[in-house]
Amino acid sequence: MDTNEHAVYITFDDGPIPESTPFILETLRKFNVKATFFMVGDNVRKYPKLYEQIVADGHQVGNHTFHHLGSFKHWTITYAMDVYDANELIHSHLFRPPHGWMRHAVYWWLKRKFTIVMWDLVTRDYSKWLNAEDVVNNVKRYARNGSIIT
């Protein structure tokens, strides 16, 4: 990440899913924007053509576990194996934990193989209380140079 460059980093979690990924890809293409997609291995298994399209369009891909596991509910080894299983399909050195948290033991285990990427701005596009205009206004208000947006 070059802090001298005026840029933000757009990321998407939990896909690929047919309900939204094609629209996202089309929009990114339209504006010639690249993003990083943190994908769930099981979704990549179900929708391999969407995964292939993300890669073909030149976007970065990251691992978001195979089953979208929360690390506090599972043994460290179980969680780590889920991440490694996802990487058999995703082939990435980037990792983002579901919900943005993980145990310290999981962090220390995974950081040996992965660059762990978090964020500093959540769009809350999933909220039923916000419309598209609210989401855009929040991003405009809180984004700064180098922000990682999810």
Predicted segments — roles?
Residues 31-34, 57-61, 110-119, 145:
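Glycine-enriched alpha-helix->loop->beta-strand junction motifs that scaffold or abut catalytic
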Residues 148-150:
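Conserved active-site loop/cleft motifs that coordinate metal ions or position small ligands
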